Curated annotation (Swiss-Prot):
Top-level taxonomic group: Bacteria
GO-annotated cellular components: cytoplasm
Gene: dtd
Subunit structure: Homodimer.
Alphabetical keyword list: Cytoplasm, Hydrolase, RNA-binding, tRNA-binding
EC number in record: 3.1.1.96
Entry protein name: D-aminoacyl-tRNA deacylase
Motif window: Gly-cisPro motif, important for rejection of L-amino acids: 137-138
GO MF: D-tyrosyl-tRNA(Tyr) deacylase activity; Gly-tRNA(Ala) deacylase activity; Ser(Gly)-tRNA(Ala) hydrolase activity; tRNA binding
Pfam families, per database record: Tyr_Deacylase
Length: 145
């Protein structure tokens, strides 16, 4: 599993000109599920993101978690994160888990975050989406599990 975590002031995802998910201060998550991923990996990723101290305290140090700042989450499934670019010029996506299992695990991931009392907005699995966001920092982390 690979999750790109971007600290944002606000973010939204649109499909065909319609906003389907929108948040204020929090994190934008681009989520890639790979072959072999199972529920324990999803739970670990959600827990790690919930506790990761990526927000600044009053002294400007990154000591606060998403929960500490009351942040929101925008989660978007993105199989292209699992691209293999080692050979040739065309990325290979053979490592990306195929639906319906990948959709199920992405939904489980979002449910884990919601169960931890986060407000979670999402894109639509498999849809062509337009994402708008304002990075805060920028502060971006790639979580590989």
């Amino acid at each position: 599993m690979r999750v790109v975590i971007q600290r944002v002031n606000h973010a939204q995802v649109n499909i065909n000109g319609k906003t389907v998910g929108k948040i204020g201060k929090g994190v934008m998550l681009l989520v890639g599920i790979k072959n072999g991923d199972e529920l324990p990996v999803v739970k670990k990723a959600a827990d790690k993101i919930a506790k990761m101290r990526i927000f600044e305290d009053e002294e400007g140090k990154t000591n606060l978690s998403l929960k500490d700042v009351g942040g929101e989450i925008l989660s978007v499934s993105q199989f292209t994160l699992m691209a293999n670019t080692k050979k040739g010029n065309r990325p290979s996506f053979v490592d990306a888990m195929r639906p319906p299992k990948s959709k199920e695990l992405w939904e489980d991931f979002n449910k884990e975050l919601e169960a931890d009392s986060f407000h979670v907005e999402t894109g639509e699995f498999g849809a062509d989406m337009q994402v708008e966001l304002e990075n805060d920092g920028p502060f971006t982390i790639v979580l590989d599990l």
